[in-house]
Amino acid sequence: MTKLSAFNFQKWIDEHKHLLKPPVGNQLVFKDADLMVTVVGGPNKRTDYHDDPVEEFFYQLKGDMLLKLHDTSTGEFYDVPIREGDIFLLPAHIRHSPQRPQEGSIGLVIEPARPEGVLDAVEWYCFECSGLVHRAEVDLESIVDDLPPLYAAFYNDEKLRTCPHCNTVHPGKNPPEGWVAL
């Protein structure tokens, strides 16, 4: 067994800061662990909602973020600001869209590995009628590798972006002006 040791987390963040900006935006701290410990940097813009089959722990280290939530049992969309120094535990299967509009913001997200055969999903909702436009599921092993192809497929296909309820075409990557307000 390899000898275990601690490391300075702030130094790790400083050494990986160049990866905490678009287009990558996040980095796994531990590659071979049962916990996915991810550092996420801002700014980011996203229009999808993640349906995560496990809990997610958020700790906002620097700057503020906004967690957009969708309660599928009531249809309600609402925002939870997570300020610098705040923590938040998101239950499994709560649709959420993490927004980090501030340049240089940094958050820590911790979640358990998925049980075998359990899928993650990303969903896009219509900005006009709030109906579900598209859902894509994935057997998630790597946030960095497995999610980008789902986004690319949606963004590059107008048919996938067309709302089946009102025929409005979803804007893809770019949310409407004012969608994120801290």
Curated annotation (Swiss-Prot):
Any one GO molecular-function label of the UniProt entry: 3-hydroxyanthranilate 3,4-dioxygenase activity
Amino-acid positions noted as binding Fe cation 2 in the UniProt annotation, renumbered to this chain: 126, 129, 163, 166
Cofactor details (free text): Binds 2 Fe(2+) ions per subunit.
Broad EC category: oxidoreductase
Catalyses which reaction(s): 3-hydroxyanthranilate + O2 = (2Z,4Z)-2-amino-3-carboxymuconate 6-semialdehyde
UniProt superkingdom: Bacteria
Annotated EC: 1.13.11.6
Record: residues binding substrate: 56, 100, 111
Binding site for Fe cation 1: 50, 56, 96
Protein's GO biological process: anthranilate metabolic process; L-tryptophan catabolic process; NAD biosynthetic process; quinolinate biosynthetic process
UniProt xrefs under CDD domains: cupin_HAO (cd06123)
Cofactor: Fe(2+)
Residues that, per the record, bind O2: 46
Pathway where it operates: Cofactor biosynthesis; NAD(+) biosynthesis; quinolinate from L-kynurenine: step 3/3
Alphabetized InterPro entries for the sequence: 3hydroanth_dOase, RmlC-like_jellyroll, RmlC_Cupin_sf
Keyword Metal-binding: yes
Alphabetized Pfam families for the sequence: 3-HAO
Keyword vocabulary terms for this entry: Dioxygenase, Iron, Metal-binding, Oxidoreductase, Pyridine nucleotide biosynthesis
Keyword Cell division: no
Primary role: Catalyzes the oxidative ring opening of 3-hydroxyanthranilate to 2-amino-3-carboxymuconate semialdehyde, which spontaneously cyclizes to quinolinate.
Similarity comment: Belongs to the 3-HAO family.
Subunit structure: Homodimer.
Name of the protein: 3-hydroxyanthranilate 3,4-dioxygenase
Organism: Brucella anthropi (strain ATCC 49188 / DSM 6882 / CCUG 24695 / JCM 21032 / LMG 3331 / NBRC 15819 / NCTC 12168 / Alc 37) (Ochrobactrum anthropi)
Gene name of this polypeptide: nbaC
